[in-house]
Design a protein with these regions (language model features):
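Hydrophobic-face positions in mid-chain alpha helices that act as interaction patches
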Residues: 98-202
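Secretory-pathway/luminal and periplasmic proteins that interact with or process carbohydrate-rich
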Residues: 8-19, 90, 107-116
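Secondary-structure transition into beta-strands, especially the periplasmic turns and strand N-termini
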Residues: 10, 89-98, 102
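Aromatic-anchored glycine-rich loop motif in surface-exposed flexible loops
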Residues: 1-69
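Well-ordered alpha-helical scaffold segments within catalytic/enzyme domains
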Residues: 61-65, 83-90
Length: 202
């Protein structure tokens, strides 16, 4: 729970606050809520610095509590360390970021996580993510989301679908950059939608 709370607050702080290094976290970030509150509770926004203090405390505590084994759809020690490394980087603690990343890589390698090959990369994004799956590849943590889960407009898949909100698209400039090398494996996971696909005519 600590790792997921830290991850959630990290995402909210990035979304609603300036980067920490902009003003050493002095500006407003997200609201920190660590207790169960009443439905009419109106939390005040904390500073970015306060948010990062909470995020780091949560993630550092979680690293010592989480298990090391792979568990599909569940966060483990290596995923928490990876996330902590990213938080340290955003916080400007480069040495801590490097040390956490090294610890995550070494631990993951000991537990048979392996980087995808170029041949595996295009299909890895559509691998089975059900709880029964034992496939992990280089995935440290992922959300279990099946085609049968909440197929309506509030589902995760609808956010990225060309027929939905289309929030997961790459920019044209980035796509053109990738096309400079026709062997770039990332081109194989991009679905180029036409305007007709992307917009409803109704």
């Amino acid at each position: 729970a600590l790792a997921l709370r830290g991850m959630s607050l990290f995402d909210l702080t990035k979304l609603y606050g300036y980067p920490y290094t902009y003003d050493n976290g002095a500006s407003l970030g997200a609201s920190i809520v660590t207790d169960v509150v009443e439905k009419d509770y109106l939390p005040q926004r904390s500073t970015v610095a306060q948010c990062y203090d909470q995020i780091i405390n949560d993630l550092e505590a979680s690293v010592s509590l989480l298990g090391e084994d792979f568990n599909k759809g569940k966060i483990n020690k290596w995923a928490a360390l990876t996330l902590l490394s990213r938080v340290y980087l955003y916080h400007g603690d480069n040495e801590k970021a490097l040390n956490a990343a090294k610890a995550a890589i070494e631990g993951a390698e000991c537990h048979q996580y392996q980087l995808w090959t170029n041949a595996e990369y295009p299909t890895a994004w559509s691998n089975d993510v059900s709880e029964a799956s034992t496939n992990k590849g280089e995935v440290l943590f992922e959300i279990i989301n099946l085609t049968t889960d909440s197929p309506g407009k509030e589902s995760l898949g609808y956010l990225y679908s060309p027929h939905g909100y289309y929030d997961g698209c790459v920019t044209k400039s980035f796509y053109n950059f990738l096309k400079k090398d026709n062997d770039d494996v990332r081109l194989k996971i991009i679905n180029v939608a036409t305007k007709a696909q992307g917009y409803s005519s109704s």
